Amino acid sequence: MYGRNINFTLLAPSLWAVVKAIGSNVEEDKYKRMLFKTGDNNGFIIEVFENINVAGKKIETMKAMQGLSEQAMAKVSIQEGSVIKN
């Protein structure tokens, strides 16, 4: 199992409509995405993949959020990693 966490702070609360279009909740066999709101301008998107190969093919959400950052509409940070097995 592999995961990606996309944290963001929006320039304005009105940008939530854009984020909802980008990061709406999805549940598929090998992929799950959840959008969380932590404040008027902040939130995070969690993506869970079956493995790193699936993560490499599912980059649309990450690219769209990075696009908001490049346009100075949001501050975005991204972390990825594998589940630690006991």
Q: In which residue ranges do the predicted regions lie?
A:
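Short S/T/G/P-rich N-terminal loop/turn motif that feeds into the first structured element of a domain
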Residues: 1-64, 71-86
